[in-house]
Regions:
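Catalytic cores of extracellular degradative/oxidative enzymes
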Residues: 38, 66, 76-89
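Surface-exposed amphipathic alpha-helices with a cationic face
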Residues: 4, 51-55, 89-105, 142-148
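Mobile, glycine- and charge-enriched loop segments
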Residues: 1-15, 62, 95-101
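Divalent metal-dependent hydrolysis catalytic cores, especially in the metallo-beta-lactamase
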Residues: 24-43, 103-105
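A short, structured active-site edge motif that brings together acidic residues
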Residues: 64-71
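Charged catalytic cores and adjacent phosphate/nucleic-acid-binding surfaces used
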Residues: 1-11, 21-27, 45-51, 72-84, ...
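Short acidic, glycine/proline-enriched helix-loop-strand junctions
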Residues: 44-64
Length: 238
């Protein structure tokens, strides 16, 4: 069977997004997606609500429960977990995820991480393309995956509806379970495109409002003005 869907994106259950569960479902149906791995920051609540919605309306979409957690070494994604991970100390985090039968993904390796090599050795897949990351660091992620002979994946890391289409993935699962295929199968990216600069500003402004951070808000306004003056606001990250 061929699976087509998204890995690593965010909804209104994240602190930097207002993307609704209903809009995610509509996107999936309109683009013939049959699996979704929603990975909100620090919580599986969004993924659980997504699954409830799919089950309520009996939709042909497989939902994998997961989240993106800020561990002691940086962001790591846990998929196929049953409850929120409690320990953020990296070694304990890994044990807890594996204890739940989960899968570990390494998102945007060269953005906000420490001990990158250590993380790479413990995860199941490494993200070699992130639409919110520049070309140079995506290339470094590809080399990292190759060095440790790790399976790979690509992600939109979408925080807005517009970004959802940046990275649709496809893989096949015939003689094994979906979860085993998600961990081991070769995943193809059908349309990897970078996000626009204004989308990053938008998500950070949402974060500043949800956290009531005036410092972050004004820093993003400043960045907005800078991008306008340099005519980059509506350009894709390069």
């Amino acid at each position: 069977m061929k699976f087509r869907g998204l890995i690593h994106f965010h909804s209104c259950y994240s602190y930097d997004s207002v993307l609704s569960i209903k809009k995610i479902i509509n996107f999936a149906l309109n683009n013939n997606l049959n699996f979704l791995c929603l990975t909100d920051h620090e919580t599986i609540e969004g993924a659980q609500e997504l699954k409830k919605y799919v089950e309520k309306y009996n939709l042909p979409i497989k939902i994998i429960i997961g989240a993106e957690y800020k561990t002691s070494l940086g962001d790591v994604i846990a998929l196929n977990i049953k409850s929120n991970i409690k320990s953020m100390e990296f070694d304990e985090f890994v044990k807890e995820v594996k204890g739940q039968g989960g899968i570990l993904l390494f998102p945007h390796p060269y953005k906000g991480h420490k001990e990158i090599e250590k993380i790479a050795q413990h995860v199941d897949r490494i993200e070699i393309f992130n639409s919110r990351v520049d070309k140079k660091n995506n290339k470094k992620a590809f080399k990292l995956a190759k060095k440790y002979n790790k399976n790979t994946y690509c992600a939109s890391d979408a925080h807005t509806f517009l970004s959802l289409k940046n990275c649709i993935l496809e893989f096949e699962s015939e003689k094994t379970s979906f979860i085993k295929a998600l961990s081991n199968a070769h995943i193809t990216c059908l349309n990897c495109k970078n996000s626009f600069y204004f989308e990053i500003i938008y998500s950070q402004l949402i974060k500043s409002i949800k956290y009531r951070s005036f410092l972050l808000f004004f820093s993003q306004v400043k960045q907005f003005i800078k991008l306008c003056l340099t005519f980059r606001l509506f350009r894709r990250i390069s």
